[in-house]
Amino acid sequence: MTPGALLMLLGALGAPLAPGVRGSEAEGRLREKLFSGYDSSVRPAREVGDRVRVSVGLILAQLISLNEKDEEMSTKVYLDLEWTDYRLSWDPAEHDGIDSLRITAESVWLPDVVLLNNNDGNFDVALDISVVVSSDGSVRWQPPGIYRSSCSIQVTYFPFDWQNCTMVFSSYSYDSSEVSLQTGLGPDGQGHQEIHIHEGTFIENGQWEIIHKPSRLIQPPGDPRGGREGQRQEVIFYLIIRRKPLFYLVNVIAPCILITLLAIFVFYLPPDAGEKMGLSIFALLTLTVFLLLLADKVPETSLSVPIIIKYLMFTMVLVTFSVILSVVVLNLHHRSPHTHQMPLWVRQIFIHKLPLYLRLKRPKPERDLMPEPPHCSSPGSGWGRGTDEYFIRKPPSDFLFPKPNRFQPELSAPDLRRFIDGPNRAVALLPELREVVSSISYIARQLQEQEDHDALKEDWQFVAMVVDRLFLWTFIIFTSVGTLVIFLDATYHLPPPDPFP
């Protein structure tokens, strides 16, 4: 190969590298020119009284969580800061068309914008990435950060609540006479008055839904244009979020409603079953466990009571009353004529009147089936007819052994003894017959007393059943109305359609 051809080959191989080498050298020369005598601690103001305008924006990548217990909101964001540093401007034509540079954040002046309402004392960003400097002197810095900001939680309508959490940014080192803050610009470079959602990396929260995300510039008192020394401007970003209540509906409210139904059906359980008290106390203990579980979720505040706690307390009061009223029902059920005498008003109200309204009907006792006496058409001897009438014809029991009147027990009717010891004593029975009739009369009285005792005891049991049914319908009405009143109130608690009406 001739020397000329070798030179041509080397020139062809080195030609693609020449622009890159020249570009690196041009960028290096530009850096040396820009930072020759540059002091990153000096504010980029042409005059002493000039204010540096800093645009503050926020790009939301993820709403990590909202800790109601600690009143803390965790977010993953990109802080979008933009300002103009006249010392970092150049003519692209003089530097091989270089239009922008990426420079480490430590090398340039920074407006020192930090989160004021942080909850962990960390004011810095997570990573000091490089700033992008354009040829006209504009500087843009988008450092990522995980912020834990304080958020005042309103627990009145928990878990059907919405919260208004704020992130307050301000310059920590400069007041409003040195640095002028303004709301950030959108991706298109136009005015942007809300938090920008990073479409590519945004992760939706499973518990909270973002409703509004506006921002607002808070001017210090006085002239908002000129600024005042010692006072700082603030840019506040609002996150108005609404809770997704499905988790609490399935895991808390639905079990509470089922437990309330158990407490209601305690009054449908017969007192003889022996489980009325056990079922009531079981429901009461279950609600107590739910209250203990919710205590770790709700902030410890005395300003208001959450709506779910109101519902649990309402249910607990109902279940407590069900325990007390079950005791009353059992007390009525086990009463007897030997221990309690039924008042007339109790009999009138709970036996004769209330059952009609409660759709209760007391079964009627079956009548004694007695054969009809045979009709003797042919005349017979006097002894035979008397014998037939003695053994076949049965006098009414109320006539021989009258039942005492339950309403007026003092009224009594004559009994069988009037046939034994009449007032005129005209008819005298043989001593053997008198002893037989006296024994029969004693046995009949004992049977009658036992029958009356059982009847009065059944009356008390029927009163207990009527009271049980009355409590059942009362609890159904109170539970339905109370549940609707408590939860319908939450349906009117909605986020405002306009965050700044």
From Swiss-Prot:
InterPro entries: Neur_chan_lig-bd (IPR006202), Neur_chan_lig-bd_sf (IPR036734), Neur_channel (IPR006201), Neuro-gated_channel_TM_sf (IPR036719), Neuro_actylchol_rec (IPR038050), Neurotrans-gated_channel_TM (IPR006029), Neurotransmitter_ion_chnl_CS (IPR018000), Nicotinic_acetylcholine_rcpt (IPR002394). Residues 333-469 are cytoplasmic. The gene is CHRNB1. It is found in: Postsynaptic cell membrane; Cell membrane. Its main location: membrane. Residues 1-23 form the signal peptide. It comes from Homo sapiens. This is Acetylcholine receptor subunit beta. Glycans are attached at N164. PANTHER family: NEUROTRANSMITTER GATED ION CHANNEL (PTHR18945). Residues 24-244 are extracellular. It is linked to Myasthenic syndrome, congenital, 2A, slow-channel: A form of congenital myasthenic syndrome, a group of disorders characterized by failure of neuromuscular transmission, including pre-synaptic, synaptic, and post-synaptic disorders that are not of autoimmune origin. Clinical features are easy fatigability and muscle weakness affecting the axial and limb muscles (with hypotonia in early-onset forms), the ocular muscles (leading to ptosis and ophthalmoplegia), and the facial and bulbar musculature (affecting sucking and swallowing, and leading to dysphonia). One of its GO terms (cellular component) is acetylcholine-gated channel complex. Disulfide bonds join C151-C165.
